[in-house]
Amino acid sequence: MKELSVLLNPKSVLLIGASRKEGSVGYVTLKNMILSGYKGTIYIVNPNAESILGNKCYKKIEDVPDIPELAVILVPSLYVPEVLKACSDKGIKVAIIISAGFKEAGPEGEKLEKEIEKISKERGIRILGPNCIGVINTDPEVRFTTNFASDMPKEGEISFISQSGAICVAILDFAKSRGIGFSKVISMGNKVDIDEVELLEYLGNDDKTKVILMYIEELKNGRKFIEVAKRVSKKKPILALKAGMSPEGARAVSSHTGSLAGEPLVYRTVFKQAGVIEVSSPLELFEYASLFASQPYPKGNSVGIVTNAGGPGIVATDALIENGLKVNELSEETKNKIKPFVSPHASLKNPVDLLAEADAEKFEVAVKALYEDKNIDAVYFLMAPQRMIDIEKVARVISNYAKRKEKTFVTVLMGVVDVEKGVNILREEGIPFYRFPDVAARALAHSLKYSNFIKERKETYRNFELDQSIKEYLKKNKGKGFIDLDLCFEILERAGFELLPWKRAFNEEDLIKKIKKIGFPCVLKIASGEVVHKMDEGGVILDIKDEKELLNSYRKMKERFKKKIKNYEKVIIQKMVKGDFKEIILGLKKDERFGHILLFGLGGIFVEVFKDVTFRLSPVSVEEADDMIREIKFYPFLKGVRGEKERDIEKIKDFILRLSFLSQFATEIKEMDLNPVFVFEKRKGAFIADARIRV
């Protein structure tokens, strides 16, 4: 953490590549640093200048009289390795490489990037970048920036970690228009060394940061990110915008910074489990953060709306309810506080519609009544522009209550021109405001979700005894791809799962012998792992009623597969189950960055049709297993609805937790499907009917 402190709070800085040419990156970077009011010492290396902007220049790095804490490198990429070595020789331990032209520029740039990565590791010099705009720290005791693209932002409590410098600049510019400040801004660029995990941990412990924003293109250290984000998100909200959430977006990410985007599903699972709030646009990133930074989190979901327009009030109500909030009718006590001071035609139910004639005094009466109502958790102020309203007076009413911070206060000022004078007051006061009801509703909903998230919830994990031979099975078959079905079944049985009765057979005589233990009707399946989609490829024959039909089915199956696979004679016979059961799916997928992802949902032939599934990263806690079961749309049918019998949900939970534990034990598993799993009535169990495992 010491290096990150130097990165953001350097006592002295060395600029290599500062320029006299106005408008150049080297010139603007130095100018912005000076204008920001930086409290430390600035050293400049430029062999062709005596001074720049009143600061003395040195010909070489070794000529600098002291050892600066931080180096800021602005030279062309080709010279960066040489400059980095010279900085290390000087004793500098931390460097920001602003220069572009590395991995994002093609093969030659990638070679240069690998070279500077090697220098960093061998010499112990920490690097932010390359291809970034560096850092901003608005702390009055520091006032430091390496940003060449925009002015120093207003001081605030939001910090921003971004892989894209352009996104940083856009967010800063938008924030300036709203009067919202920042504490720290860090542009990571190509992340050759310092990454978002280290920065997240640092900001998690930073007293001047209340809300953390992140723009992510790729996470290289996925497991560490989850560990850190889980810890930090309990102290302060983390809002993340993940780029590359579509196949086209993933390709754009690859060409933009040389990163390969992970699967959207994986990232969404990671964010959800780590307590990270995912947003879908840079606008949402800012809009939500401004509320988080300025207002207390709601204690409940009850919202009181004050408005001067019926239509927008309805839109706001719909948006709030759609996002999980409640707009309940007000108590008679609250109505009576408002009634004597407003039009007899005003609606006092909720929304409180004061009509177009509302002025600042009427608004204040209504706002005060809702603010004092203990049944209201958040006050939602919504005003449509009206020429007869003194918007500046209204803005002062808003500011007065928003600054109290005893209750969540959300402001929506619709329109632009006619509300601008009021907006200017809110901007100066640092009060967040929204232009439209739906955005404000989503921001408030996320604030409530975070409020619920930080309430203490225990996490308990269940351990199981697993047969050690499972490891031997998997090691022996590692790298073979999908393993044979009989081997899948043996692994699952040794892991404690219940399966439908089954036997393996190698020839007709063996088949007749084994069927006596299973009984009719039965199911015949090809056992070879080479046949991945058994049902589609004719590798499953259902409802076989007698020995004659069984032998005929076996002969047909052998004929079908003898030219396609090696072990075409090996088959599985299972008891054909008919009756009252529901089908679910359980699965695992190993992700290179994050480890095993566990899937649960509606199973059987409906998996691909309805895609009613949910995911968690392994290990899964007992509480998370409960959440998974409740999250799918099919849950009411498992619980019992409209005369349906309740299913064995405890056994489903046992299977989820057992699978999670198995994934921690059997790391060789790359992919697993348990589908279908038949779930019977409560206390009557669940049984795996089919499975596939890839190692």
Predicted ranges, named:
Residues 1-695:
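Catalytic-core regions of core metabolic enzymes
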